């Protein structure tokens, strides 16, 4: 399964991301296929996504590398190591963002019935850009809220 690391500190803004990067390196064995990061500043309501040294080359041209740009004023930070099971392409990169950038999802597990859920969400008008269960989970959340978990079969964390 994948690996997730993160922290939240509402009282104090942090800028250094090296601790997050080190934590994610420690769990690299949990996900050899990719790594990704998302950091959030609750005061300014801004977010930044990062790739890492083990991210696919195509992603490195789309976002900054956490090693080369290790500073962002933030309160909340997540790192993710990906072990690809369903969609093996870079399109399954996590943290996974909604099309408008308002929702960010980190997901560890496998949704066995994601194809059935995807068909239902397609009928409701959602347009998918990947073949991964992560996007199905996010689309389900945007459609049904936390009730999406009631419809998912499989191990989810």
Give the role of each language-model region.
Residues 109:
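Conserved phosphate/oxyanion-binding catalytic-loop motifs
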Residues 1-106, 139-157:
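N-terminal glutamine amidotransferase
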Residues 134-138:
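Short, conserved phosphate-binding/catalytic loop or strand-edge motifs used
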Residues 121-129, 146-148:
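Short, polar/flexible loop-turn hinges at active-site or ligand-entry regions and domain interfaces
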């Amino acid at each position: 399964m994948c690996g997730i690391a993160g922290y939240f500190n509402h009282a104090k803004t942090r800028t250094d991301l090296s601790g997050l990067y080190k934590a994610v390196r420690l769990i690299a064995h949990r996900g050899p296929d990719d790594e990704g990061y998302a950091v959030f500043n609750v005061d300014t309501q801004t977010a930044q996504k990062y790739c890492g040294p083990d991210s696919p080359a195509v992603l490195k041209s789309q976002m900054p590398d956490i090693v080369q740009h290790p500073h962002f004023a933030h309160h909340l930070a997540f790192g993710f190591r990906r072990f690809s099971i369903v969609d093996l392409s870079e399109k399954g990169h996590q943290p996974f963002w909604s099309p408008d950038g308002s929702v960010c999802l980190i997901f560890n597990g496998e949704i066995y019935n994601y194809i059935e859920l995807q068909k239902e969400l397609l009928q409701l008008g959602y347009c998918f850009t990947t073949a991964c269960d992560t996007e199905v989970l996010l689309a389900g959340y945007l459609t049904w809220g936390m009730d999406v978990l009631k419809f998912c079969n499989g191990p989810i964390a």
